[in-house]
Curated annotation (Swiss-Prot):
InterPro entries: Ara_Isoase_C (IPR024664), AraA_central (IPR055390), AraA_N (IPR055389), AraA_N_sf (IPR038583), Fuc/Ara_isomerase_C (IPR004216), Fucose_isomerase_N/cen_sf (IPR009015), Lara_isomerase (IPR003762). One of its GO terms (molecular function) is L-arabinose isomerase activity. Mn(2+) binds at residues 306, 331, 348, 447. Its cofactor is Mn(2+). One of its GO terms (biological process) is L-arabinose catabolic process to xylulose 5-phosphate. Keywords: Arabinose catabolism, Carbohydrate metabolism, Isomerase, Manganese, Metal-binding. Belongs to the arabinose isomerase family. The keyword Manganese applies. Binds 1 Mn(2+) ion per subunit. It catalyses: beta-L-arabinopyranose = L-ribulose. This is L-arabinose isomerase.
């Protein structure tokens, strides 16, 4: 995958000087035990680093300032081991510009009824501290995540891990750079939008390039480079020659290999991690990039067709959040309306993300009726089954809106021998009629990002962090 820089999360444990040095040393020792256990659990995608105990306002403020300017720190996890007066937290919490998780837990899972005394009560009063601390976060409208339960339980660790992925994506949002090869498809409405507002609100940089800029990179690709990549294709996929001669078929595939090399080189040279294409802007290109785009999506680059920069950026963001697992660009195509079998067939003219493949992809070559270019190569496969979320972003003039529809994807049971593109099928929730109606009434686009790895809660958490209006259909 197109990798992130290494990230870590700081663990800030709240207490106060009132309890005395002996008690504070015990708090710190228990905090270290929790930190070590969480890091050794194997359940968390990023490491936790324990910081000094938060026992006064200056200390809290300084650690939050440091979080902001340390790029490797993706967020803060707090735990109120004892009562920690929340006025101490106001300044630092207001300054904090990264995601915050309040872990409402305590060191002991159970109350030791046989030995409990006031010393134990004073040392272990998270129930007391949680409410004081929770109030100030609510008062500050911090949009922090709250995870409740014993820190050693797998369910609690799962929730922390999912939040970590959201926090990592939030940080990456300010590094999303989209290269647009050509403009939006002419006369299409929903794919357009305010790029300046997107950069202000989400941190996304969106740059236009004429297709000739990419053609220069394509022309510079060496045959030896194509040979190496073609050999990789042979090891990774089945080859379906169809009605083409082997020479003609391989010539088409080699064109796509040159595109993959050129696009990747262009993106990496400019620091871009997402891109768009447009079949109306292909001057100097022999084919519409298909296989090339699919391969790059599989490596973690965000993508959307027809110049749809919002979906390309969202694709990159959700790939980071999901570790590029079963997440990719998609388009609503065709309804299945038979009673009891209602579903939506998802595909695209070429560019369906191979992270969604349930079968070994095959490379095929087939004519493309639009774009007026040579027959392009593409990967064909059937999509995975599983519960997931479908996400679309649209610009409503006064604000962006994110639509989130829960779906159940299933593997097709009927062959489609004449369909020369990958296909994904899903049922929308709560049911076909209400789900589709809600999507249309709320202005959901035909371009989406689907993930069979992420949850609604994760996508909503990101939306809250960036102040993004959202609708959940489930």
């Amino acid at each position: 995958m197109l990798t992130l820089k290494e990230k870590e999360f700081w663990f800030v444990v709240g207490s106060q000087q009132l309890y005395g040095e002996e008690a504070l040393q015990e708090v710190k020792a228990q905090a270290q035990t929790v930190t070590d256990a969480l890091n050794e659990s194997g359940a968390l995608p990023y490491p936790i680093v324990l910081k000094d105990l938060a026992i006064n306002a200056d200390q809290i403020t300084n650690v939050m300032k440091e979080v902001n300017y340390r790029d490797e720190v993706a967020g803060v996890i707090t735990w109120m081991h004892t009562f920690s007066p929340a006025k101490m937290w106001i300044r630092g919490t207001k300054l904090l510009q990264k995601p915050l998780l309040h872990l409402a837990t305590q060191f002991n899972e159970s109350i030791p009824w046989d030995t409990i005394d006031m010393d134990f009560m004073n040392l272990n009063q998270s129930a007391h501290g949680d409410r004081e601390y929770g109030f100030i976060n609510a008062r500050l409208n911090k949009q922090n995540k709250v995870v409740v339960g014993y820190w050693g339980k797998s369910e609690v660790q799962r929730q922390i891990a999912e939040w970590m992925d959201v926090a990592a994506a939030y940080n990456e949002s300010f590094n999303v750079k989209v290269a647009r090869f050509g403009d939006n498809m002419r006369n299409v409405a929903v794919t357009d939008g305010d790029k300046i507002e997107a950069q202000i609100q989400f941190g996304w940089t969106v740059d236009y390039f004429a297709i000739g800029d990419l053609v220069q990179y394509v022309n510079a690709v060496k045959e030896e480079e194509i040979d190496v990549l073609f050999a990789e294709y042979k090891d990774s996929y089945d080859f379906d020659y169809g009605d083409y001669s082997k020479d003609d078929w391989e010539a088409s595939v080699r064109v796509q290999a040159s595109y993959e090399i050129a696009i990747k080189r262009f993106l990496d040279d400019g620091g871009y991690n997402a891109f768009t294409s447009n079949f109306e802007d292909l001057y100097g290109m022999k084919q519409l990039p298909g296989l090339a785009v699919q391969r790059l999506m599989g490596q973690g680059y965000g993508f959307a067709g027809e110049g749809d920069w919002k979906t390309a950026a969202l694709d990159r963001l959700l790939k980071v959040m999901s570790h590029n697992q079963s997440t990719g660009f998609m388009e609503d195509y065709t309804y299945e309306l038979a009673e009891g079998k209602e579903a939506i067939l998802q595909s695209h003219m070429l560019e369906v993300d191979p992270t969604l493949a349930s079968t070994k992809p095959k490379i095929t070559v087939f004519p493309l009726g639009i774009g007026d270019r040579e027959d392009p190569a593409r990967l064909v496969f059937d999509g995975k089954a599983g519960d997931g979320v479908v996400v679309s972003m649209a610009d409503f003039g006064t604000h962006f809106k994110l639509l989130i529809n829960e779906v159940n994807a299933f593997e097709p049971t009927t062959p489609a021998p004449n369909l020369p593109v990958a296909r994904v099928l899903w049922e929308v929730k709560p049911n076909f009629q209400d789900g589709v109606k809600a999507w249309i009434e709320n202005g959901g686009g035909h371009h989406t990002v689907v993930s069979l790895n992420l949850t609604t809660d994760q996508v909503v958490s990101y939306a809250k962090l960036v102040g993004l209006d959202y609708i959940v259909i489930k």
